[in-house]
From Swiss-Prot:
An individual GO BP term: translation
Alphabetized InterPro entries for the sequence: Ribosomal_bL28, Ribosomal_bL28/bL31-like_sf, Ribosomal_bL28_bact-type, Ribosomal_bL28_sf
A Pfam family that the UniProt record links to this protein: Ribosomal_L28
Record-linked NCBIfam families: L28
GO molecular function terms listed in the Swiss-Prot or TrEMBL record: structural constituent of ribosome
HAMAP family documented for this protein: Ribosomal_bL28
Family membership noted in the UniProt record: Belongs to the bacterial ribosomal protein bL28 family.
PANTHER family reported for this sequence: 39S RIBOSOMAL PROTEIN L28, MITOCHONDRIAL, LARGE RIBOSOMAL SUBUNIT PROTEIN BL28M
Cellular component terms per the entry's GO annotation: cytosolic large ribosomal subunit
Statement: the UniProt record of this protein carries the keyword Ribonucleoprotein: yes
Protein name as catalogued: Large ribosomal subunit protein bL28
């Protein structure tokens, strides 16, 4: 399991700890990842994802997982999230047609 957000592609970054004497030591900046279960209203099912706390705030701000994925850039999404986006779009298209 990689340390990458499935919705925003936030990943591990590297940098330096810098002391008062300007000594530099390598370090890693880890994203704040949380395991969450989000509800897809279009698919009527629960979806487990590993996303950053920032992405969780964005999902809630946009009004849920379906709305977030509708606006999300495909390049940033994980393979699972891309599949979800397609399924949700297909389901919404069926509902509009019916």
């Amino acid at each position: 399991m990689s340390r990458t957000c499935e919705l925003t592609a936030k990943a591990v970054q590297t940098g330096n700890n810098v002391s008062h004497a300007n000594n530099k030591t390598k370090r890693r900046f880890l994203p704040n990842l949380v395991n969450v279960t989000l509800i897809s209203e279009a698919l009527n099912q629960n979806v487990r994802l590993r996303i950053s706390a920032n992405a969780l705030r964005s999902v809630e701000h946009r009004g849920g997982l379906d709305a977030f994925l509708a606006k999300a850039d495909v390049k940033e999404l994980s393979q699972r999230a891309r599949l979800l986006k397609k399924q949700i779009a297909k389901k919404l298209a069926e509902q509009v047609a019916a």
